[in-house]
Amino acid sequence: MQSTAATPGAPVERSLIVAIVDDDPAVCASLKFSLELEGFVVRAYGNAAEFLEANDFQACDCLVIDQRMPGMSGMELISRLRTLEVQTPAILLISQPNPTVAARAAKAAVPIVEKPLFGNTLLERIREACPRS
């Protein structure tokens, strides 16, 4: 049996923090559960305004943002964050592929993951965005 005790003097690696911004409570709960099982710390927000109001996006290692939300779309939120000089990697969730949104996402170097989510696609994108995960 392997020891789980930390080596004295060794750096302690913290869990990566993933923020989910999606107006569907079932999607938020499902993603939160799945990502926590993978060892991530997950913070869920019901819309862009709630996320911006929380003002803790600098502490996040990766953002998972739904495109279709009331008030502000996912790409609008990402653009707003970039204007605020937040460079946290973001992943856009999209349920209806749209060439205009895809072009904006590509220009912003934001990967798209299509809903419904199947397999490990989202997890793979998060790991690509945060290589130490």
Predicted regions mapped to residue ranges:
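Active-site residues of response regulator receiver
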Residues: 66
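Receiver (REC) domain active-site loop signature in two-component systems and cognate sites
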Residues: 69
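Non-catalytic signal-transmission and effector/linker regions of two-component phosphorelay proteins
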Residues: 1-19, 25-26, 32, 100, ...
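Acidic catalytic/metal-coordinating carboxylates
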Residues: 46-47, 73-76
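Hydrophobic/aromatic residues positioned on beta-strands within the core alpha/beta folds
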Residues: 93-95
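Short amphipathic alpha-helix used as the core "switch/output" element in two-component signaling
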Residues: 53, 75-86
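Acidic, metal-coordinating helix/loop segments flanking the phosphotransfer/catalytic sites
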Residues: 44-62
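His-Asp phosphorelay/catalytic-motif detector in bacterial-type signaling
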Residues: 59-61, 85-89
